[in-house]
Amino acid sequence: MISISEIHLKNFKSFKNTKLKIPDGFTAILGPNGSGKSNTIDGICFVLGKTSAKSLRAGKFNQLITYHNGKRADYAEVTLFFDNINREIPIDSDKVGICRKVKLNGDNNYYVVWYEVEKQNTKINTESSQKKTSKASKVEKRRRMKKNEVLDLLSKISLIADGPNIILQGDLLRIIDTSPNERRKILDEVSGVAEFDEKSEKAKKELSQAREYIEKIDIRINEVRANLEKLKKEKEDAEKYTVYNKKLKVTKYILTSKKVEFLKMVLDETKDEIEALKETKNCYIQDISNIDSEIIGLKVKINELVNELNEKGSEEVMELHKSIKELEVNLNNDKNALENAIDDLKHTLKMEESKNNDLNETKEKINNIRIDTLKKEAEAKVLIKEIEKLNEERQNLEKKVEQSESQVKALKNQESKLSERINDTQKELYGLKNELNQLENTLNNRTFDYQKNNETIENLTNQIAEFSDLEDTKKLYKELEDIAVELEFSKKKLQEKITERNDSQSKLDNLHSEYVKENARIKTLKDMENFSLDRAVKGVLDAKLPGVVDIAGNLAKTKGEYKTAIEVAGGARLNHIVVKKMDDGSRAINYLKQKRLGRATFLPMDRIKGMDAKDISDTGIIGKAIDLVEFDIKYTNVFKFIFGNTHIVDNLENAKKLSLKYKARFVTLEGEVIEPSGAMVGGNIRRNSAIKVDIDMKKLTNLSEDIKELEQILSNVKDEIERLNNKINTCSTRKLELDNRLKIARDQEFKKEEITKSNNLKIKELNMLNSKIDDEISELTDEKEILSQKVQNLDNKLSEVMGQRERIVNEIKSYENSELSKRIKEIDHKIRENESSKNTLENEIKKGAILVKEVLIPKISELNSNIKSLADKKNMFKNSVEIYKSNIESNSSILSDKRGKYEELTKGLKDLTDKKECYELEIENLQNNKEELREKATDIDNQVNVINVDRAKYETRLEEEERKLYLCDTLENIEDISDEMIEETYSLEIDDLERNQALLESSIKKLEPVNMRAIEDYDFINERYEELFGKRKEYEQEEGKYLQLISEVQKRKKETFMKTYDRVAENYEQIYGEIGGNGKLSLENEEDPFSGGLLIDASPMNKQLQNLDVMSGGEKSLTALAFLFAIQRLNPSPFYVLDEVDAALDTKNASLIGDMISNASKESQFIVISHREQMISKSNVMYGVCMENGLSKIVSVKL
């Protein structure tokens, strides 16, 4: 077992430079009070790692450094040397030291110290020679170490500064007086259950981590579940949308196919119907012909009857009968003619109006052309005059030219003929070129249309391509998961921090309350003793220093009934001096120092801040203190600082009730105060007194430090809350952004589907159009090639003729005078130009004249003729209407008269007349049948016309339906459609198909907009959901594993602890028996010892078993020492340090304890500080400590 061999104290407390050898066994240190004997124990604790200067009986670590002769040393250093023969410390040295050094600036350093043997060569001079000898010496080595490394090293050799083997002054009674739980923890340390605690803590951390993972997984699962539920409906809609679209495509294709078939069938039927109607019409015409034959036969018979009547009756009857029939026929014809005349009149009026409109438009065109022609004729006349002048000049020039008449004439004749040929050819070429230009224009237009369609197709294709790089929603959903976890955990941490803030705020409020109370107590004492304060204030105000305003109380006023309450609420702060700036306050403070006027408090307006009072409306509340005071608004912060969250109430009873409800300061009208903490201030208001009292500022200082510390903690917590709030806001914003991006992605997907569908349809239509244009271009190109070839041939012919003419002209030029020829040439050129311009104008005039003469004037004539004809017709029809109306009236009257007369004359010729009438009736019936047949024939013509109109409509519809069929997706191109669906759709009629199409289109419209990514996203999210559930099960298994591990560790911890407890309890009973009494240890909770404490019962000699609480100080010390020795016997420490543990023992018990230490020192080192002879006499070595010149000195005595 390792032991301390030596202690070196250098500049440590009262020791300047002291080395203290510590042998095995029992070492006693004694000396008078204040000699510094306990400083040796402090040195040991210092090296063993005490972290608090106060535990070493110093304010700060640098106060451990020796202070002597008015000067403090540069550092303090203590080294504990250990016997390392067994190499328990892993350094190859028999003696190893642990050193701790503290400097004036408070820096602490640790070192490991050992000694190495080095040989040194020395020379010895003699008279005859020099000899070399070697001498071994020990050299100190040290290596700096970290504190944790030192503590780990000490722990390995069972040396701990806070262990039960080091008992300082007062520790013995603290062991007894401490709580049972703290006492049990001593056994925890002895039994080594900390190892299990570490394992348990590690397992708990792992368990916590597993649970945190589960919590995170649950958040992810909830987020994924929410997305899954949202996507489920969208997926179903997308699937429906896909199915509906497929059905719609099939329905459209089959419906359009059936419509095409139906229209073709209808056209065939109409063709057959027209043929049948024409055959029927032919039958009617044949029937009419037959009726005409019958009518002729009947008329012959009637003539015979008439002849017979003539023979038998008077001619007058016959004439009268004939006249009646003619009148009846004429009357019927006039009625029919009247109806027709009225219809014709209406039609004529419409035609007349239309022709008049055309006539006005045509006249306007003629007028415009005539105006234009007059302008051009004027221009042409000017050109003609100029040409005449030029021709006259040319003739004069030609007369002057002498030339060979015969040759020049012949050449000119040839040139003239060639010119005519050239003119004819040019005209023909001009016409062909015009035709070619028109053809090229048409070709260019169609080519332009073709290219424009291609550009449109390219644009439409590009529009589709723009949607190829849509945002990956899988990444967005994954990021939403991460954000959800971060957001939920941030909210959880925020709640924890808010709870911590509230707790800290509550503690702070309590501390503030205590501080205010203590400060008020101190202020009262100061007010009682320090009457110079008013003098200081008065001195500053009288000095009228720059920036000094006044005391706060003078800057406000209140009503008389509130005076006491406001004075108490403001307290001494009302006497604080208000200054404009901090510099003004500094100036006033310096003034007080210079004049020695005392002290005063200053409130700088540029820095002072206060607390806003909360709004409280309840029984007894008069108002906020600050609201019951009148002051200039610029002093608002000053009075916020003075009054804070203070409210004035009517009486103490209401104040008490209000303080239970609200966290505020309440002051009654009589001056009682209830602080937010619940503290109450009241009673009789006392005046200043001259009695002086000592003022202990320690509590106030401690409260102030605690407040600062808690305020810092609260500030940190608030910062963390703010950070978490910012993080939550950031996460929430990010989540909204991701949700928005998801929505945009869904909308873009739907837009892509819509645009793709629409654009593909347009592209297909444009391709169909381009196919037709391509055919047109091909035809136009062929025509262009033919025309181009004709133009080329004419160009070649023209070039040849012009070449011949040029040769002749050159030959003529050779006979001509050069100067005259040049002028003639210029004249000819000018004439040609003018002729050309004149011809152009004449052509345009001719065109206009032709247009007027051949088109517009004939059209006007035609229109006038038509209008005149229509006017004549109109008049004729009007006259006809009047005539027919007059005839009908006249003939109706005549017919009535003749019928009366006829009836009188025909009484005797009834049979013949009846027979004749019968024939006439039969003729009339035949005529009616004939008319009916004519009408039927006319109806057939009308029906044929109607059918032809309908046929034209059907042909247009067929063309449209064929176009639609071309644009439809064929059944082969529609994916995933069943034969059953096709057969079922084919089985429906057109009406059913149209209804189905309307229903499908309506269903699709209701579903829109559709998230077409939902199917893919749903599958992805569903897989993620399953994956997360799998992970959760894994973490649940981990959780179970750690729970089981914690349970096993706790079980082993309890078993280990109980073994230690049983042995310590046994040792305790044995040791207490050795000192003449009975003792017993027991656990508060034997089932779960760690949830309870350790109880110690003892019965000193000749006393009953009793509780610690009723024992004397000596009995408690004896019991504590028995407890410590019981532990020592169980697990002896390498050494023990006891500082005046026998102080409360009587002589007998001190001797007994001395014997126990002496016996125990056979196994462990004991260093004991004591004044008792009974203790010291049992030691092996004794050190005496005394104080000389402010430094401790040590004298050793071996006993």
Swiss-Prot record:
An example Gene Ontology CC term for this record: chromosome
Cellular location(s): Cytoplasm
UniProt-listed Gene3D superfamilies: 1.20.1060.20, 3.30.70.1620, 6.10.250.3110, P-loop containing nucleotide triphosphate hydrolases
Keyword field: ATP-binding, Coiled coil, Cytoplasm, DNA-binding, Nucleotide-binding
GO biological process: chromosome condensation; chromosome segregation; DNA replication; sister chromatid cohesion
Phenotype on disruption: Mutants show a high rate of anucleate cell production and a subset of cells that is extremely enlarged with irregular morphology.
Segments forming domain SMC hinge: 546-658
GO molecular function, one term: ATP hydrolysis activity
Coiled coil: 192-528, 691-1051
Residues that bind ATP: 32-39
A Pfam short name: SMC_hinge
Predominant localisation class: cytoplasm
Biological function: Required for chromosome condensation and partitioning.
Written domain comment of the UniProt record: Contains large globular domains required for ATP hydrolysis at each terminus and a third globular domain forming a flexible SMC hinge near the middle of the molecule. These domains are separated by coiled-coil structures.
Quaternary structure (record): Homodimer.
Family: Belongs to the SMC family.
Name of this chain's protein: Chromosome partition protein Smc
Organism classification: Archaea, Methanobacteriati, Methanobacteriota, Methanomada group, Methanococci
Gene: smc
